[in-house]
Swiss-Prot record:
Alphabetical list of PANTHER family matching this protein: EXOSOME COMPLEX COMPONENT RRP42 (PTHR11097:SF8), EXOSOME COMPLEX EXONUCLEASE RIBOSOMAL RNA PROCESSING PROTEIN (PTHR11097)
CDD domains on file: RNase_PH_archRRP42
Organism, as annotated: Thermoplasma volcanium (strain ATCC 51530 / DSM 4299 / JCM 9571 / NBRC 15438 / GSS1)
Coiled-coil stretches noted in the UniProt entry, renumbered to this chain: none
Transmembrane regions listed in the UniProt entry: none
Protein name: Exosome complex component Rrp42
Gene, per the UniProt record: rrp42
Amino acid sequence: MVKESAEILSEIRKNYILTTMKGGKRIDGRLPDEFREITIIENYVPRANGSAYVALGKTRVVAGVKIEAGEPFPDTPDQGVLTTNVELLPIAFPSFEAGPPNDLAIEVSRVVDRGIRESKMISPDKLVIEQGKKVWIVFLDINVLDYDGNLIDACTIAAVSALRNAIVPASREGGEDFKLPVVNTPISVTMVKIGDTLVCDPSLEEDQICGGRITVTTTEDGHIRAMQKGEIGVFTLDDVKKAIKMSLKVGKNIREKYFR
């Protein structure tokens, strides 16, 4: 990811990573299907309607939820609205700059949003205040504090965590506050191709030398909710099948460990 702006690895370092991978291990000692350590702190931003801090290895992000009443979209008058935004703070990585979102921020926003939306994580019909006139709009903002690889999965985990503890401020509209109606837990698993091997949760160095990236978002019922291919590279049909199998296994493990 962001190869054009990342620090260029020396050929010696690249060869070391590839040689180590041939032995079945990664340079940090992980197995191909092993995530880095995950830390989740819920309600990290007290004034938000929902929030979470997530550290995935040295990649750190904060997701915040703000819920306000507003008009529904004309084509979905009986549904609430979700809008997702990812901001790459300049402090997170040398090439990140202030200003309009770049291609990476846009891609991460879309992949996170698609996984949540297509999984039907939130029950949109339960966010209606007055059909056709007023609904709850869920603003999901994710700030990247430190980038060391695999933004998509870090942002997805933070987004899901923040939404799961979000409170709808219905008292502002004369009702009673209630928990955001969450139906399931979508988890994205991002994999890259190192040589001929698929590895999940790529570090920054693995991202820089990969031969393609693929993200698969699944839910606890075993359904695939979203897929995204990134970076330059080719995935065979067998690669895609392996990626799906790995995403189902790893996604299940993450849900069981962090989202009971």
